[in-house]
């Protein structure tokens, strides 16, 4: 199975991607991860990407596509893969199609995990992380016994910059503006399937399998 997984930040996409990867025995390819890996290993493409990343700029499509292509050519992708974080734009989607056509492959399905913005806002802005041990709590769903204090090590809990309400709202805005055209693009190609994210991870997994036609 060759899958693309879409979902807003905080929609639980990573967790589902890991599950599907082990269920189908296909690699979970996170573009962010392979980009960082190339930078760390100082590959030619990694060096080029780093120049942009160091300036806080987006890495150009041609570099990202080349990095993704190299990853898709590895042996473990022969029987399928799960792409996460790519494509983000229609231009990238078209480039990916060309790459796959060269490899004699095509995308089977594009899975979109849908969670209402207000739900994501509640999930993310309620998260609290321990400064000492990194344990994660939630003011509504998993509150610490003592406010602001970690149950595990007694460390201080804090809210990450990424989880602040204004930041989350901005990230969601950017995500929708960028991804909506992509969702339409794959819908028109008859590849899009949608799973509605639930409160419980296991319930979301059920929705995901149903959307993919796997029980």
UniProtKB/Swiss-Prot annotation:
Major subcellular site? cytoplasm
Pfam families assigned: ADK (PF00406), ADK_lid (PF05191)
* Reactions it catalyzes: AMP + ATP = 2 ADP
Localization of this protein: Cytoplasm
Question: Got any disulfides in this one, which pairs?
Answer: none
The pathway is:
Purine metabolism; AMP biosynthesis via salvage pathway; AMP from ADP: step 1/1
* Annotated stretches, region: NMP: 30-59
State the family it belongs to: Belongs to the adenylate kinase family.
Q: What is the annotated role of this protein in its UniProt record? A: Catalyzes the reversible transfer of the terminal phosphate group between ATP and AMP. Plays an important role in cellular energy homeostasis and in adenine nucleotide metabolism.
The record's domain comment reads:
Consists of three domains, a large central CORE domain and two small peripheral domains, NMPbind and LID, which undergo movements during catalysis. The LID domain closes over the site of phosphoryl transfer upon ATP binding. Assembling and dissambling the active center during each catalytic cycle provides an effective means to prevent ATP hydrolysis. Some bacteria have evolved a zinc-coordinating structure that stabilizes the LID domain.
What is the name of this protein? Adenylate kinase
Organism equals Caldicellulosiruptor saccharolyticus (strain ATCC 43494 / DSM 8903 / Tp8T 6331)
